[in-house]
Amino acid sequence: VDCIRERTEALREFIGKSEDETEIIRRTESLLPDIAAAAGKLFSPNLKPVINATGTVLHTNLGRALISRKHAEHLMAIVSGYSNLEYDLEAGARGERYSHFEKLLCRITGAEAAMAVNNNAVMLTLSALCRGGEVPVSRGELVEIGGKFRVPDVMAQSGAIMVDLGTTNKTHLSDYANAISEQTRALSKVHTSNYRIVGFTESVSPAALAELGRSRSIPVIEDLGSGCLVDLAPLGLR
């Protein structure tokens, strides 16, 4: 019914504005096929394969990281039936869905613990650790990514209080140290993936910030946006 109304209304508007009799007749005669095509689109999948000719391998608008055919076939076999997603087959009892990847991620990265979410990792981290407290972040790293996601907005939504420090082009480790107070819940660093500040610049390395955090017993949160555990430089990628 919606398709009938939409296509009919579109035809009425065209007839009211156009003086092209031939086109009016053509559109009137094709009204029923147009309605059928519009209705068919409602039940057709929207996602379609495309060719990435942008030069950007991990394209945020084109699906980001790809899954190999081998792993895609394995996933198809899993998601098209029942699985042990939250069931411990050895114990014969309820399990944790995170157990399938946590140990592997810890082994690969050397982390003490690991968690995976499908989105909003930074906001979830800030909300869990920093709600109501202060989080210093460099003024030169207050990024905005596609979709109008801004660091200040994410901080506010999480309940954390953002403390911007340094200047647009230079931030020193001492800026972070001076910003620490009794209300500080974490130190933050954001990867500027979609722009660069060049020239008379200075920034704090993740290692230096982590050392400061350890010395003050304050967690350090680094928002990488995306990353890779394998060095792709030999392949000409950066």
Task: Go through the PLM ranges and name each one.
Residues 34-36, 59, 90:
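Catalytic, metal-anchored helix/loop core of enzyme active sites in primary metabolism
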Residues 57-61, 88, 136-138:
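Short glycine-rich or small-residue beta-strand-to-loop segments that form or flank ligand, phosphate
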Residues 52, 61, 84, 118-120, ...:
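Asparagine-centered polar/low-complexity signal
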